[in-house]
Amino acid sequence: MEKIVAVVICGLVALSAAGRSAAATNRDDLLRSASHLSGLPVRRVVPEEVLASPRYDGALLQATYREYPRLLRSIDTALYARLGLMPRSLQAQLVPDARVSRAWYDPAARRLLLRRTPTAQRTRVVNELVRALVDQNFNLRRITGLRVRDRDRALAARSIVDGTAALASGVTASPVQGPPLERFLQFESGLGPGKALAKELRYLGGSRALASALRLFPQTTEQLLHIDKFLERERALPVRLPTRIGDWKLSASETFGELDVRSLLRAFSVPNAVPTAAGWGGGRVGLYVSPTGQTTAVLALRWDTIDDAVEWRDAVTRYVGAAFPGATARDCPPLDRCWSSTWDVASGVLGTTSVFASGRASDTIAAALFTQK
């Protein structure tokens, strides 16, 4: 009997060892495949951890909150509401649904997280391993905290990393659908533009050209969207928002890039959104708060040419019609047009500068920005 037990134990140990060996072999094969497809060398083994769904979701959510803290989510919630991206009474769901993810590389911990069930497809695992290789060769921790400091730059950096991984693995973006806020956030993900830039760079200069984008990162989403802007390292035109306008105080301010403008127009199916946004030269969005706690959003943009600014002015009319249904238009010099709706809205273009405001006293605030030197 003791001999039988010993044989069974030995058999189980052998099977366990064989299972571990097979898993290690499969992991190594996937890493080699990621290296071959991306052209990035393997510097070290990528640690991995298989987690039950609750732990996996928790780890992903914690990482998201680390890069997108509560204060920033609160600012964006107020901003998106005043841009008409969601109903006034709705609390924005700005954090991605972790349940759709099955594999994810965490640059902070430098490990690959895998959901136990359902398991990730091979292409998704390879995609995350390519991101791990980008980290090994170019250090993704450089992006840590960037979203808090510079919205547009963070979008550009994240997009070229995700685009490089998608180009290698074959992962494609999901079809854009849903209400305006969901559409906006899907367009903002930047997977398509990042993949397109990675493909162009590889075509023009091979792996070395792509490596330059991963080493330096596009500084703006304009550079992400236009390879000539990236190669020239063209900087955004400066945009300043005053700290006070009358009794209203600037409470928050972020960069607002070409991808933001494009995504905002596309979220409402505004015609010619892409060519309109292409004239972007610089942008900033901010929230002004009154002494009584009311909040108004402002969007100040600079355009490359007067014609580009005129294109934006024409697009704004269609955007307001879609984002603020039933809005009543009125003249409000020196601005081009004001509207009354769920939010009071005001817009104006002067030369190559445009101002858009949404909220209480939007016409007064926009006019002050419109005429500032």
Where are these regions (language model features)?
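Short pre-active-site segment immediately N-terminal to the catalytic Zn-binding motif
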Residues: L112-V126, A156
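Bacterial N-terminal signal peptides
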Residues: A6-S16
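N-terminal mature-domain "stem" immediately C-terminal to a signal peptide or N-terminal signal-anchor/transmembrane
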Residues: A22-S74
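Post-HExxH zinc-binding segment in Zn-dependent metallohydrolases
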Residues: L30, L133-G178
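Catalytic glutamate of the conserved HExxH
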Residues: R124, E128-Q136
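C-terminal soluble interaction/assembly domains
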Residues: G281, T292-K373
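Pan-zinc metallopeptidase signature
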Residues: F184-T295, A300
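Catalytic zinc-binding patch centered on the HExxH motif and its immediate surroundings
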Residues: D57-L71, S89-A109
